[in-house]
């Protein structure tokens, strides 16, 4: 296939992403994810059932990229660290590569984390741009993670790298990753969490929803940049698991802590 025959496909994993409207007890002064909510009004959206809560990104990732269920693996197993060390694996990347797509992974964290650098090659990705290959200058307020804004240009670079092919790019964010500090680390937070909880928990939720706003801005910026390229493109954004904040089924409007949200965008009408 050529770029004229098929659209670019960008799949974006939103680390620890949860629509805060889904949490019954959580209130805030303004909507931290306006881009996500606007997309929900205009494009396909829904719930995604994931195998993990609070951690274990690689296993949500594995299910999304291969269509295989973690139920067929051992308790606590990470296929990236077991079977994919021995054999390759069909999935979205390999299937799209077989019909002529360029296939790329992009992540602003270490390439060896979850053995991704090996796993992605076994899954049919042509390239993997990890943080070792990026000029990262800014970090999240907890000091732990690269901010996600760098992923806009890094994702666009993958589309530019193959002028004659459509591309499948899988981009993984990290900015909303825990931990969520119990002390106030953002001096004048734009978004303030409220609810029946103590000050430490308030600080944690306030930190989290402000980081949600950062990833929401990343989503908006990525869409703008893709729109400037004048190529047919589909983007899917999805949450890999709920944040590590002790949420229970009864706290969620979905009634299930193993449900996250996804939303799509396209420029094809």
Where are these regions (language model features)?
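Solvent-exposed soluble domains appended to multi-pass membrane proteins
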Residues: 2-7, 11-14, 18-269
């Amino acid at each position: 296939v050529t770029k004229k025959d098929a659209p670019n496909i960008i799949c974006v994993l939103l680390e620890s992403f949860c629509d805060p409207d889904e949490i019954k007890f959580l209130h805030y002064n303004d909507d931290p994810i306006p881009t996500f909510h606007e997309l929900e009004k205009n494009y396909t959206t829904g719930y995604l059932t994931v195998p993990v809560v609070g951690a274990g990104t690689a296993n949500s990732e594995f299910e999304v990229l291969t269509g295989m269920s973690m139920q067929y693996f051992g308790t606590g197993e990470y296929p990236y660290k077991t079977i994919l060390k021995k054999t390759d694996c069909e999935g979205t990347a390999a299937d799209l590569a077989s019909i002529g797509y360029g296939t790329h992974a992009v992540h602003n964290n270490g390439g060896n984390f979850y053995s991704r650098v090996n796993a992605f090659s076994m899954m049919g990705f042509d390239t993997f741009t990890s943080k070792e290959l990026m000029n990262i200058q800014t970090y999240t307020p907890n000091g732990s993670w690269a901010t996600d804004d760098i992923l806009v240009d890094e994702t666009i670079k993958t589309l530019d790298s193959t002028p004659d092919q459509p591309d499948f790019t899988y981009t993984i964010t990290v900015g909303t990753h825990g931990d969520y500090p119990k002390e106030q680390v953002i001096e004048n937070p734009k978004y303030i969490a409220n609810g029946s909880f103590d000050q430490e928990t308030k600080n944690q939720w306030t930190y989290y929803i402000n980081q949600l706003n950062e990833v929401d801005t990343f989503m908006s910026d990525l869409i703008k940049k893709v729109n400037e390229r004048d190529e047919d493109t589909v983007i899917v954004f999805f949450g890999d698991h709920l944040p590590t904040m002790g949420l229970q089924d009864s706290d969620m409007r979905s009634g299930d802590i193993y449900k996250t949200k996804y939303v799509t965008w396209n420029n094809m009408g």
